[in-house]
Regions:
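Juxtamembrane helix-start elements in MFS-like secondary transporters
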Residues: 111-120, 180
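Intracellular loop-helix junctions on the cytosolic face of multi-pass helical membrane proteins
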Residues: 1-113, 268-303
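Structural signature of the two symmetry-related core transmembrane helices
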Residues: 145-164
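Short hydrophobic/small-residue motifs within alpha-helical transmembrane segments
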Residues: 124-125, 235
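Helix-to-loop junctions at the C-terminal end of transmembrane segments
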Residues: 129-145
């Protein structure tokens, strides 16, 4: 929704280019909406966020220490696999979502930044349905199997989208109700849905790792487990902006940012498709390899 506001409402008001005035307006709007959202979240959970509503809080809590993080990461193999899988996905996701990459995709390759944002929003709306389906699938088959299954689906859809962009004229996607636009929306919808299923399974898999650590050591340390992952995740994903900006510089954008309406050169096309689809595919392959070495399936958790 915000993407539509940024690119359909705000961008035309500032001359159709990404400039300081546009970025300033975006920052102010995001801060205001984030504050309102934070207040609403606090109000929404206040009735239920009470100690008596949660199990396991009577278990002795362990403070978060660096040595504990190192020890758990060293001894907890499922956590090692999870970090490798989730972090590789995250760095690809962060890179692909950089504004400079989305600008090249929507404003240069597709050639219609406003319509591209609307199409992206349309393809994201059904994700809540996929999240519900993904959660049920993970409950039936286990988080590890759910991650593996939906990652394979992501790989297939990513490969199809790469081929799709190679064989068509991408600018046709910007033509309302064209066959290219419809195919792009459908493929993107299912890819976003599959990624949502992976994200849902990742969340439940973190809980499985906490339970595994409790069974392995007798310590209930959700903060240490989640803190270890979050610490490594933030370090790794911080390279997303560096990868995007360095890649853009390699194709000639050394002193300016890509702007909607720039010429769609071969370099722009290859780089954008590579960072949007090929890089995530490498991350998904890393996920599948990591899950091969992880033994924390549904049978193990039930046992």
């Amino acid at each position: 929704t915000l993407g539509i506001v940024f690119n359909v409402v705000l961008l035309p008001k500032f001359g159709g280019t990404i400039n300081l005035e546009y970025l300033s307006a975006v920052c102010k709007l995001v801060i205001m909406i984030s504050f309102i959202g934070l207040v609403l979240v606090c109000l929404g959970v206040s009735e239920f966020d009470k100690p008596e509503n949660f199990e396991g809080l009577n278990v002795k809590k362990e403070p978060l220490k660096v040595k504990d993080m190192v020890a758990i990461l060293k001894e907890n193999k499922p956590l090692q696999c999870y970090v490798a899988a989730a972090a590789s996905d995250k760095i690809a996701q962060v890179t692909a979502s950089q504004a400079v990459i989305t600008t090249m995709m929507g404003g240069i390759i597709i050639g219609n930044m406003g319509l591209s944002s609307i199409l992206g929003m349309v393809s994201m709306l059904p994700s809540i349905i996929f999240a519900i389906f993904g959660a049920r699938y993970a409950g039936k088959r286990g988080s590890q199997e759910a991650i593996t299954t939906w990652t394979k689906v992501c790989l297939v859809l990513g490969a199809i989208l790469i081929v799709f962009f190679v064989v068509i004229d991408p600018s046709k996607i910007g033509v309302m109700f064209s066959s290219s636009m419809i195919i792009y929306v459908v493929l993107t919808l299912f890819l976003n849905g599959a990624k949502m299923c992976v994200s849902t399974a990742n969340t439940s898999f973190m809980a499985d790792i906490v339970d595994y650590e409790l069974d392995r050591t007798g310590k209930y340390v959700p903060a240490v487990v989640s803190g270890t992952y979050s610490f490594l995740d933030k370090i790794i994903s911080s390279f997303g902006a560096l990868i995007a900006s360095t890649s853009v510089a390699l194709i000639g954008y050394t002193s300016t940012m890509p702007q909607p309406g720039d010429e769609c050169t071969t370099g722009v096309l290859v780089l954008t498709i590579g960072l949007t689809y090929a890089l995530p595919m490498l991350g998904w392959i890393c996920t599948l390899v990591a899950m091969k070495f992880c033994h924390l399936n549904r049978e193990d958790m039930v046992a």
